[in-house]
Swiss-Prot record:
It comes from Rhizobium leguminosarum bv. trifolii. This is Nodulation protein F. SUPFAM superfamilies: ACP-like. Proposed to synthesize nod factor fatty acyl chain. Involved in trans-2,trans-4,trans-6,cis-11-octadecatetraenoic acid biosynthesis. The gene is nodF. Pfam families: PP-binding. It comes from the Bacteria.
Length: 92
């Protein structure tokens, strides 16, 4: 079972994926879990920058990487969750 942070980040990424795909996610994608690759949801580097900005605002953190670095390091939703979790812990 996913923890609250994972659920919230999946919801944020799902909302972004829907907006990137004309308001819906194709049924062929299936369930969105932490293992889901960002590219499989139609999230490109520009959309990833939006996600990172939203997460910074939501959790009061600063993600110290440019979008190119983020794109190479954050391949799936779980990578995003763990990056945010680490930054939240550092801020505490």
């Amino acid at each position: 079972m996913a923890d609250q942070l994972t659920v919230e980040i999946i919801a944020a990424i799902k909302n972004l994926a829907q907006s990137e795909n004309g308001g819906r996610i194709p049924a062929a994608i299936g369930d969105i879990t932490a293992d889901r690759q960002l590219t499989s949801l139609g999230i490109d580097s520009l959309a990833l920058a939006d996600v990172l900005w939203d997460l910074e605002q939501a959790y009061g953190i600063r993600i110290e990487m440019n979008t190119a670095d983020a794109w190479s390091n954050l391949k799936n939703i779980g990578d995003v969750v763990e990056a945010v979790r680490g930054l939240i812990a550092k801020e505490a």
